Amino acid sequence: MERKLGTDRVKRGMAQMQKGGVIMDVVNSEQAKIAEQAGAVAVMALERVPSDIRAAGGVARMANPSLVEEIIQSVSIPVMAKARIGHIVEARVLESLGVDYIDESEVLTPADEVFHLNKSDYTVPFVCGCRDLGEAARRIGEGAAMLRTKGEPGTGNIVEAVRHIREVQAQVNKVVHMSKDELMTEAKNLGAPYEILLQIKENGRLPVVNFAAGGVATPADAALMMELGADGVFVGSGIFKSHHPEKFARAIVQATTYFDDYERIAEVSKDLGEAMTGIDVHSLAADQRMQERGW
């Protein structure tokens, strides 16, 4: 049967609609409803949040289709779900379930250590993680409609997300000020498609939205990432590992929307209880660093 493929323009346009918003990880329909009521622009359906995936170890896979369907039916906002890097069938199954976006995610155990998915071959838009412009451009070249920093998921530590957003921004600025003659050499240095770098130079920015993810644990963290130029925020473990998830979720949304209103951020941050326990990323062994997955 011939598949109908969404165009890059349509997929990127769908992702643009989430700009300025918060996307929350949820593991059941109750959490999905809390996220929607708090003002999330979308939810990410998965069986365990990144901190629990990290603690459990073993192989992390796509969520059970029954759970994904339950969450889709429980909310009116878009629903995303994660597939393992390079796992063609997980992605096809999620597409068949009717998810609005697929996250080809390093949070799950990669299925393929050589190839990422050919995301242009799907109707549903994809979101992918990146640490630098080389990774960002390769994922866009494969058809990703939305990017996010990798950060270091499940740590509650924002330092890696900050590093990644700053690195991408600096490299984008460098490309914008290059001559076209220099772009091919830069494409070689970055391992990036020349056509994507040309789009960046001509538009003055990435051709897709780039959200912050990986370590957002407080309203101030969310506001910081927006201040640094992120187009929106993914929050994984931070909300439902906090003492007051409903209040915490609303505070994250407010801080993301009004990221430069520091009095408002101070107000919404009051009486939230203790944030999730964090992990010093420098204490992680190399095989525990999820951001290293993919290329």
Curated annotation (Swiss-Prot):
GO terms for biological process: amino acid metabolic process; pyridoxal phosphate biosynthetic process; pyridoxine biosynthetic process. Catalyzes the formation of pyridoxal 5'-phosphate from ribose 5-phosphate (RBP), glyceraldehyde 3-phosphate (G3P) and ammonia. The ammonia is provided by the PdxT subunit. Can also use ribulose 5-phosphate and dihydroxyacetone phosphate as substrates, resulting from enzyme-catalyzed isomerization of RBP and G3P, respectively. D-ribose 5-phosphate binds at D25, G154, G215, G236, S237. Keywords: Lyase, Pyridoxal phosphate, Schiff base. In the presence of PdxT, forms a dodecamer of heterodimers. This is Pyridoxal 5'-phosphate synthase subunit PdxS. D-glyceraldehyde 3-phosphate binds at R166. The active site is at K82. The keyword Repressor does not apply. It comes from Oceanobacillus iheyensis (strain DSM 14371 / CIP 107618 / JCM 11309 / KCTC 3954 / HTE831). One of its GO terms (molecular function) is pyridoxal 5'-phosphate synthase (glutamine hydrolysing) activity. It is an enzyme of class 4 (lyase). CDD domains: pdxS (cd04727). Belongs to the PdxS/SNZ family. It holds the Pfam family SOR_SNZ. It catalyses: aldehydo-D-ribose 5-phosphate + D-glyceraldehyde 3-phosphate + L-glutamine = pyridoxal 5'-phosphate + L-glutamate + phosphate + 3 H2O + H(+). Pathway: Cofactor biosynthesis; pyridoxal 5'-phosphate biosynthesis.
